[in-house]
A protein has these predicted regions:
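Beta-sheet-dominated interaction scaffolds and their linkers
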Residues: 42-63, 160-175
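Intrinsically disordered, low-complexity Pro/Gly/Ser/Thr-rich segments with frequent PxxP/GP/PP motifs
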Residues: 87-115, 203-229
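Terminal connector regions
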Residues: 113-157, 230-267
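Asparagine-centered strand-capping/turn motif at beta-strand->loop junctions
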Residues: 64-67, 181-187
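Bacterial N-terminal signal peptides that target proteins for export
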Residues: 12-28
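Surface-exposed binding patches on compact interaction domains or structured appendages
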Residues: 45, 63-109, 194, 201
């Protein structure tokens, strides 16, 4: 997400696995190239592009809808943290058969311990179709996985996630003759951003396509085209709890960090 944007269905990470192929090697490689550059049309869809887990409750739910033929789905939670072998979450049911044009509620359950209690954390919910066996031997079967972020918010956080984008600290600094944009997140929530644009004079640069900045994290980006003759402005889209995008902007300074303000909220 990319790490930042909350993808709608196939904008999420997907795993396309070649299960069985009885054709010649050259044909398989050619077909694989087409599959990797073509959006796979899955039969299942999720009711949200992100899942916010309120730590005041023992579980959070999301609905899987099957728009195709009968399918078996497998669901689990994992982490992108290096070295993490498991996370204190379970999904029930972990395996479910969903009939065509029907839906299945997935319950993500927290074990009660193991996650930070002073800030928001992120894990990933995976929902994967398991291809059904076919009678045809010369068959290429695909396992399509959809992956969305689960934002776990422990109970007792004295902060408002809606204000998180306005708490980011933006600053331009000069480092060895280069202009560097710094972004600091002093808050308790992750901020997912997209379409980050820096305007200085007649120049408009997009130093970041999309990203997510964690609580307490700072990111830096070198600005290639910068005009010091005018006041620079930054604008960006931030994804809220409902998966919609709100636009923020601020006037930058190289003397002190500044906050952005909301200028357009999604309906």
């Amino acid at each position: 997400m990319c790490g930042a944007c909350e993808p709608r269905h196939f904008f999420c990470n997907q795993a396309v696995n070649i299960m069985f192929c009885r054709h010649s090697l050259s044909f398989c490689l050619g077909l694989l190239g087409v599959l990797m550059t073509t959006q796979v049309d899955a039969g299942i869809s999720l009711s949200a592009t992100r899942l916010v887990f309120d730590g005041k409750h023992k579980e959070a739910g999301i609905t899987v809808r099957n728009n195709g033929e009968d399918v078996l789905i497998q669901s689990w939670v994992d982490s992108d943290v290096p070295g993490a072998t498991s996370v204190p979450f379970a999904v029930t049911p972990p395996l479910a058969r969903v009939a065509g044009n029907e839906q299945q509620l997935l319950r993500v359950i927290y074990e009660g311990t193991g996650m930070p209690v002073d800030k928001e954390s992120v894990v990933w919910l995976n929902v994967q179709e398991i291809p059904q066996a076919t009678k045809t031997q010369n068959t290429l079967q695909l396992a399509v996985r959809q992956r969305i972020k689960v934002f776990f918010r422990p109970s007792g956080l004295n902060a408002n996630s809606y204000l998180a984008p306005t708490e980011l600290l933006w600053r331009l600094i000069d480092r060895a003759g280069k202009t560097v944009l710094t972004i600091n997140n002093p808050g308790l929530f992750h901020v997912s951003m997209a379409d980050v644009k820096l305007q200085s004079g007649q120049s408009v640069e997009q130093p970041i396509d999309s990203m997510m900045i964690a609580p307490g994290e700072q990111k830096e980006f070198v600005i290639k085209q910068f005009s010091s003759s005018s006041t620079p402005h930054i604008s960006f889209m931030s994804i809220n709890d409902y998966g919609a995008q709100d636009r923020y902007t601020t006037q930058l300074s190289n003397s002190s960090p500044v906050n952005a303000s909301l200028i357009k909220s999604s309906p």
